[in-house]
From Swiss-Prot:
Its main location: cytoplasm. It comes from Nitratidesulfovibrio vulgaris (strain DSM 19637 / Miyazaki F). This is Trigger factor. One of its GO terms (cellular component) is cytoplasm. Belongs to the FKBP-type PPIase family. Tig subfamily. Pfam families: Trigger_C, Trigger_N.
Length: 432
C-alpha cells in the first residue's frame, strides 16, 4: 500500500491511497473463502463449490466486503503512520474494486489545528474567597419546613391566594362539548407557582369552598401541545377546599424528621457545609474561566467546521429542551432553522475554541482518560437522569458519543492541570 497526503487546509487532510494488485487479489480470495464455507450447490458438497461459481453468485457482496476490509485496514495503518486523530467523519471517495488492477481511493477528514500554547506556568489569576451567607441557609431551612408543612383548611370561607393549596374539580369545553384530556376531580392546585395557565388560576382565586364558576381558557400560540395551541376554550371549576400550609417549628424534631440529624444545629451545619462545597467549586470554576478566556486571546487558530456544527447542534438541542420545560416549542420563536443556527454559531465557535485549546493542553500535560473513568462518568449520568446504565452506554456507543464524552473529560482534566500551575491569589468577594 502506498499513500500521499494533501493538506486541504490547516484542519483538513486528504490521503490518496493505492492498493497493489496482490492485496486486491488476497482480499477477494478471503471474502470468497468465507462465502464458500457455508455455500451449498447441487452437484457439490457443502464448502466445496468452485471459487469462480461462488464469486459469480455473490459478486456484489464479495466485492463490497473486500473493499470494506481493505479500506478499514489501510485507514488504521495510515492514521498510525501519520499520528492523526480525525475529529470528523472520514469521507471515502473511490472507484470500484476490480481484479488485475490496483485499487485507488482517497479519504478526507478534519483534524485539530496545530498551534503553540501560550506559557501558562505562573499565570496570575484571582479567585474569590468562598463564603456562605447565613440568609441562604435560612432559606434552605424554610424550604424544608415548607415541604414538610401540614395542609389545614383555612378558618374563614375565602378564595385561595398565593401559597395556598386548592382542592377542586375542573373541566374544559369547546362549543359546549367536553374537551378530552382537560378535566380532573379532587385536583390539588398550588396557587402562585405559575404552573397553570393564568386564566385558570385567576378564576380559581375568585372561588371560595363550595362555589362554582366558569371562564375563558386561552392557550398561547406557542403552547407545547399543538392540539390546544392558540385555542380559546371555556373552563368550569368547582372548589371543594382551600388549605394553607402550617409550617413546623425549626427545632430538633424537624431536623430528625427531615434528615436524621440529632439537632437543628447539626442540620444547619450540614446545609452550611454543602453550600460551602458548592460555592468553592463555583468560585474556582469562575476563576478558571477567567484565566482560560485570557489565554484564548493570546492564540489564534482555525476551527474545524465539523466541530463547530456539532456544537451548534448541541446548543439547539439545549434550547429545545429549555423551551419544552416552559411548555413551548422551537416554532414559537418564529424563526427559521437557519436563523437559529446563525444565532447560536458565535457561541458554538467559542465552545470549539475552548475545547481545542484544552485538548492541546491535555496532550502537552500528558493527561489521559481511561475506559474505567468513561464508564464511571456514564454511570453518574445514568444515576442523575434515572436511566439504566447499560442502555445509556449502548446509546453512547451506537451514536458515537463515547469520543465526545472522552474529550470533555480530557478538557476538564486539562483545565485542572493548567490551573494547578497558575499563581492563584484569593480575594474578597465582590460587593453585591
Amino acid at each position: 500500500m502506498e499513500y500521499t497526503v494533501e493538506d486541504l487546509s490547516p484542519v483538513k487532510k486528504k490521503v490518496n491511497i493505492s492498493v497493489p494488485v496482490e492485496e486486491v487479489e488476497a482480499a477477494l480470495s478471503a471474502a470468497i473463502a468465507m462465502y464458500r464455507t457455508n455455500m451449498s450447490l447441487d452437484g457439490f458438497r457443502k464448502g466445496k463449490v468452485p471459487s469462480n461459481l461462488v464469486e459469480s453468485r455473490f459478486r456484489k457482496e464479495i466485492y463490497g466486503e473486500a473493499t470494506q476490509d481493505l479500506v478499514n485496514v489501510h485507514i488504521n495503518e495510515v492514521m498510525t503512520a501519520l499520528d492523526a486523530n480525525p475529529i470528523s467523519r472520514i469521507d471515502f471517495d473511490g472507484g470500484q474494486l476490480e481484479r488485475g488492477t490496483p485499487f485507488e481511493y482517497s479519504i478526507s477528514f478534519e483534524v485539530l489545528p496545530e498551534f503553540d500554547l501560550p506559557d501558562y506556568d505562573g499565570f496570575a489569576v484571582e479567585q474569590e474567597k468562598a463564603v456562605v451567607d447565613m440568609k441562604e441557609v435560612d432559606e434552605v431551612i424554610t424550604r424544608i419546613r415548607t415541604n414538610m408543612a401540614e395542609l389545614v383548611p383555612v378558618a374563614e370561607a375565602r378564595p385561595g391566594k398565593d401559597g395556598d393549596v386548592v382542592v377542586l374539580d375542573f373541566a374544559a369545553f369547546e362549543n359546549g362539548e367536553p374537551v378530552e384530556g382537560i378535566s380532573a376531580e379532587n385536583f390539588q392546585m398550588n396557587l402562585g407557582d405559575r404552573q397553570a395557565l393564568e386564566d385558570f388560576e385567576n378564576l380559581v382565586k375568585t372561588l371560595a369552598p363550595g362555589q362554582e364558576g366558569e371562564g375563558p381558557l386561552n392557550f398561547p400560540a406557542d403552547f407545547i401541545n399543538p392540539d390546544f395551541a392558540g385555542k380559546s376554550l371555556t373552563v368550569k371549576v368547582k372548589v371543594h377546599a382551600v388549605k394553607e400550609r402550617r409550617l413546623p417549628e425549626a427545632n430538633d424534631e424537624l431536623a430528625q424528621k427531615a434528615g436524621g440529624f440529632e439537632s437543628m444545629d447539626k442540620m444547619r451545619e450540614a446545609v452550611t457545609s454543602s453550600y460551602m462545597q458548592s460555592r468553592t467549586q463555583l468560585v474556582k470554576a469562575t476563576a478558571q474561566k477567567t484565566m482560560l478566556d485570557k489565554l484564548l486571546k493570546m492564540v489564534d487558530f482555525p476551527l474545524p467546521e465539523s466541530m463547530v456544527d456539532m456544537y451548534v447542534g448541541h446548543l439547539l438541542d439545549d434550547m429545545r429542551s429549555k423551551l419544552e420545560r416552559q411548555g413551548k416549542s422551537m416554532e414559537s420563536l418564529g424563526k427559521k432553522p437557519e436563523e437559529l443556527r446563525a444565532e447560536v454559531r458565535p457561541e458554538a465557535e467559542q465552545v470549539t475554541r475552548t475545547q481545542i485549546f484544552l485538548l492541546r493542553a491535555a496532550r502537552k500535560e500528558g493527561v489521559e482518560v481511561n475506559e474505567q473513568e468513561i464508564d464511571g462518568q456514564i454511570q453518574q449520568i445514568a444515576m442523575r437522569s434515572g436511566q439504566d446504565y447499560n442502555a445509556l452506554k449502548d446509546y453512547y456507543i451506537k451514536n458515537n458519543l463515547i469520543f465526545s464524552l472522552r474529550d470533555r473529560m480530557l478538557a476538564d482534566k486539562a483545565m485542572d492541570a493548567i490551573y494547578e500551575k497558575a499563581a492563584v491569589t484569593e480575594v474578597e468577594p465582590a460587593a453585591k
